[in-house]
Amino acid sequence: MCDEDVAALVVDNGSGMCKTGFAGDDAPRAVFPSIVGRPRHHGVMVGMGQKDSYVGDEAQSKRGILTLKYPIEHGIVTNWDDMEKIWHHTFYNELRVAPEEHPVLLTEAPLNPKANREKMTQIMFETFNAPAMYVAIKAVLSLYASGRTTGIXXXXGDGVTHTVPIYEGYALPHAILRLDLAGRDLTDYLMKILTERGYSFTTTAEREIVRDIKEKLCYTALNFEREMATAAASSSLEKSYELPDGQVITIGNERFRCPETLFEPAFIGMESAGIHETTYNSIMKCDIDIRKDLYANTVLSGGTSMYPGIADRMQKEITALAPSSVKIKIIAPPERKYSVWIGGSILASLSTFQQMWISKQEYSGASIVHRKCF
């Protein structure tokens, strides 16, 4: 199925990064930020070929003169014009394919509004003329990638976190829980606590610098109080980071205070359960007979699950909530940043999946997506 002439395209549009490539490959071909940037200033030089908008890496590299916008917020597309630009960029610039020649597998957040799915379907068929398409739920794909059909997937991305219990390949919708706390909120929180240290980050471009600091230096503490005490007593936990202009900043307890928000949403004023409690609550909404299987197959995925120490901390927190005799296993595959994409690549290349596509012939109106994709 790796025959690129007919291979399906797998496009995992995240709130933060877009992962895209061909079905049957073991990793995405292109990964770029889901951003559209527009110039903040007027062009004064003629012949520079200035554009009115930039997408992805190009927007990132020119961020100093642009205002950056993310068209996907909390896992849901909020700006369709910009989203179309991102898809156009995906097909024509990153993958260099004609979308009218390949089936397209898209991903979506669980509990995605119906109108969103319909709009995706409409754009794929009417704007890009795709021959066939399918919309799959991210968490189901990440479980696929780990080689399981039963388990609970805790997918923590840039815009949204959810826990999705899956039994024998079926998502259990009544037990899906969604937490609007994810990577972007952690970046904002890190911006705030760095301000307390005297470093000011305010613009959309500076936020990207803070995101980089977060990705390079943050980690999850196993015991928050003990870690705070260690940080106060010595400078052993301090790390330095060089800003683009050459200044060096030092960060200490911010390294673990930032990700701690995942377990303690009150840090950012959110009245909600942390990811450990959300996972537990999700399991408790399932039938009593399948809970044991879910505890033993808790799969982490998404970029926000990449903090060192997060799996051990989850293990500790869920063990404290669950019955003492039950076996708890947290699976954190090393490629979990891309496991949704990898699951999509596996799914779209299965021979049994080929009759699942919604074809252009079947498309008479966008509501078909609810009948074929579940």
Curated annotation (Swiss-Prot):
PROSITE patterns referenced in this protein's UniProt entry, alphabetically: ACTINS_1 (PS00406), ACTINS_ACT_LIKE (PS01132)
InterPro entries on file: Actin (IPR004000), Actin/actin-like_CS (IPR020902), Actin_CS (IPR004001), ATPase_NBD (IPR043129)
EC number: 3.6.4.-
Maturation-removed propeptide residues: 1-2
Record's GO cellular component terms: actin cytoskeleton; cytoplasm
Gene3D superfamilies: 3.30.420.40, Actin, Chain A, domain 4 (3.90.640.10)
Enzyme class: hydrolase
Species whose genome carries this gene: Strongylocentrotus purpuratus
Entry similarity comment: Belongs to the actin family.
Protein name: Actin, muscle
Role, per record: Actins are highly conserved proteins that are involved in various types of cell motility and are ubiquitously expressed in all eukaryotic cells.
UniProt catalytic activity: ATP + H2O = ADP + phosphate + H(+)
GO molecular function: ATP binding; hydrolase activity
